[in-house]
Curated annotation (Swiss-Prot):
Keywords: Hydrolase. HAMAP family: UPF0173. One of its GO terms (molecular function) is hydrolase activity. It comes from Lysinibacillus sphaericus (strain C3-41). This is UPF0173 metal-dependent hydrolase Bsph_4138. Belongs to the UPF0173 family. Coiled coil: none annotated. It comes from the Bacteria. InterPro entries: Metallo-B-lactamas, RibonucZ/Hydroxyglut_hydro, UPF0173, UPF0173_UPF0282_UlaG_hydrolase. It holds the Pfam family Lactamase_B_3. PANTHER family: UPF0173 METAL-DEPENDENT HYDROLASE MJ1163, UPF0173 METAL-DEPENDENT HYDROLASE MJ1163-RELATED.
Length: 227
């Protein structure tokens, strides 16, 4: 299995002959190394409906009839664009042929802005727990710090956590470090920073605040060093 980070909130997981993309915001993302023309995922996981997370989902999914797994309202809207979807909701889990997915709480918003500047409500934002090949991966999506992160870590011991540190729209470095203390992952990767001026951060500040977890600061395209 290979797990790699690709700028902003994009994570790629290659497992059991399948490619999974989380929040594939590629076009317009100056931090990513990916190109839409070169990607053809089998599975796409979405945390919420903001444009910088839905990104290029529809175009990517149509390449090889990929399954898009997303919060209910977002999944329904994407299905209306001619894409195969599986809707889920916070607290729900589902076994798939590639592994198990469980949606968790996140404190954020979720809406999509169309080309005509219409704002479409996309339901509740979520974090994602992914259980593959004996590993538990937590992608927090966009979120503030919340105390039930302790419960997430207690219920599902986490091997790798991807946490936003950009501040302004999500947790900043200090709150993200507190989130690490709640979740207690073996490895944590900072995400959702330096894409736009309001979320410019030095990830080393976050790393210096973290205790008892290994911080891996990854450039776009770099792989997580898994044990």
């Amino acid at each position: 299995m290979e797990i790699s980070y690709h700028g902003h909130s994009i994570v790629k997981i290659q497992t059991n002959g399948k490619t999974i993309l989380i929040d594939p915001f590629i076009n317009g993302n100056g931090q990513t190394d990916l190109k839409v023309a070169e990607e053809a995922p089998d599975i796409i996981l979405l945390t919420h409906g903001h444009n910088d997370h839905v990104g290029d989902t529809i175009e990517l999914a149509k390449k090889k009839d990929a399954l898009v797994i997303a919060p209910n309202e977002l999944a329904n809207w994407i299905s209306w664009q001619g894409v195969k979807t599986h809707p889920m909701h916070i607290g729900g889990a589902k076994e798939f042929d590639f592994g198990k997915v469980k949606f968790t709480q996140a404190f954020h918003g979720s809406s999509y802005v169309t080309d005509t500047k219409e704002i479409i409500y996309m339901g509740m934002p979520a974090g994602i727990l992914l259980f593959v090949e004996g590993l538990t991966i937590y992608h927090a999506g966009d979120t503030a710090l919340f105390s039930d992160m302790k419960l997430i870590g207690e219920r599902h011991p986490i091997d790798i956590a991807f946490l936003p540190i950009g501040d302004n729209f999500t947790m900043g470095p200090e709150d993200a470090a507190c989130a690490v203390s709640f979740l207690q992952p073996k490895i944590v990767v900072p995400i959702h920073y330096n894409t736009f001026p309001p979320i410019e951060q030095d990830p080393q500040i976050f790393a210096d605040l973290v205790q008892n977890s290994e911080v891996q600061i990854l450039k776009a395209g770099e792989k997580v060093n898994c044990f």
